[in-house]
Design a protein with these regions (language model features):
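Short, well-formed alpha-helical segments that are part of the catalytic scaffolds
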Residues: 1-11
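Short beta-strand-to-loop acidic/aromatic patch adjacent to the donor-nucleotide binding site
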Residues: 63-72
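Catalytic donor-sugar/metal-binding loop of nucleotide-sugar-dependent glycosyltransferases
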Residues: 125, 149, 158-176
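Residues at the starts of beta-strands that form the adenosine-phosphate
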Residues: 13-15, 65, 167
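Acceptor/aglycone-binding surface of glycosyltransferases and processive sugar-polymer synthases
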Residues: 37, 41-60, 77-151, 177-187, ...
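Acidic helix N-cap motif at the loop->helix transition within catalytic regions
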Residues: 2-3, 24-32, 78
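Short, conserved active-site loop motifs that form the nucleotide-linked donor/cofactor pocket
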Residues: 13, 36-37
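A conserved acidic beta->alpha catalytic loop
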Residues: 19-27, 73
């Protein structure tokens, strides 16, 4: 994570890392990084909970624009200025992955299906519904603040953005794959579809 933070520091002044109950020494590494705020969950609550904690804290600190990115090194921090620049006149910016050659066929199909499913339910033509590299205004966050605790958070954001008719743009991003592809599991995909249907029906 240190290399990720070193890269982010070149493009952002205020950095928040949420340690979601990890036991691999991540928190100790982050504490040694100057200019980085560390938030910790005592136990693992899931990605949705971790990102929500970070966003809540940022908004309370007076942030106007929030940029979300994963800490595993797959997101290139050099894209941060592009996200901020693209925020002009819109509420949310979604990044979509252009390089998916290392993604197994099953995951490619799953992403395509979720994209079509999202369009059918909410009318949103989001090219990468599970991409985690995104940005939004603090006002937009207050409207789309999600309840999901895990990977379905990305799709809930889209659902709420459609519900509130928020303006959005999409920009292509290159994903840096360091190891075998890791993504949303098949079981997570089914859970996401179920949650999407409930959001659409207002359940």
């Amino acid at each position: 994570i240190k290399s990720v933070l070193d890269a982010v520091k070149k493009h952002a002044k205020h950095i928040i890392v949420v340690d979601d109950g990890s036991k691999d020494g991540t928190a100790d590494i982050v504490r040694k990084c100057k200019g980085v705020t560390l938030l910790q969950h005592k136990r693992n609550l899931g990605k949705g909970s971790a990102v929500r904690s970070g966003c809540d804290f940022a908004v309370k600190q007076g942030a106007n624009i929030l940029v979300l990115m994963d800490s595993d090194g797959q997101h290139d921090a050099r894209n941060i200025p592009r996200f901020i620049k693209t925020m002009k006149d819109v509420d949310v910016v979604f990044g979509y992955r252009t390089e998916r050659s290392q993604m197994p066929l099953l995951y490619k199909f799953g992403n395509w299906f979720l994209t079509m499913y999202t369009f059918l339910l909410f009318g949103s033509r989001i090219k990468d519904t599970q991409g985690g590299f995104r940005s939004m205004t603090s006002d937009a966050y207050k409207k789309i603040r999600w309840h999901a605790t895990r990977y379905e958070m990305e799709t809930e954001m889209i659902a709420h953005a459609a519900e509130h008719k928020l303006k959005y743009r999409q920009i292509p991003i290159k994903t840096i794959y360091h190891d075998a592809y890791k993504g949303t599991s098949v079981s997570d995909g089914f859970k996401i579809c179920w949650h999407m249907l409930k959001w659409r029906l207002g359940l």
